[in-house]
């Protein structure tokens, strides 16, 4: 997973 994907979750 990408940092932005985790942050958006």
Curated annotation (Swiss-Prot):
Cofactors that this protein relies on: Mg(2+)
Gene Ontology molecular functions: inorganic diphosphate phosphatase activity
Keywords linked to the UniProt accession: Cytoplasm, Hydrolase
Known regulation of activity: Inhibited by ATP, fructose 1,6-bisphosphate and 2-phosphoglycerate.
Entry GO terms, CC: cytoplasm
Reaction catalysed by this enzyme: diphosphate + H2O = 2 phosphate + H(+)
Cofactor note: Has high activity in the presence of Zn(2+), Mn(2+), Cu(2+), Fe(2+) or Co(2+) ions. In the absence of metal ions, there is no activity.
Compartments, record wording: Cytoplasm
Its EC number(s): 3.6.1.1
Enzyme class: hydrolase
Family stated for the protein in its record: Belongs to the PPase family.
Assembly information from the UniProt record: Homododecamer.
Identification of the protein by name: Inorganic pyrophosphatase
Source organism (scientific name): Blastochloris viridis
């Amino acid at each position: 997973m990408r940092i932005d994907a985790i942050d958006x979750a």
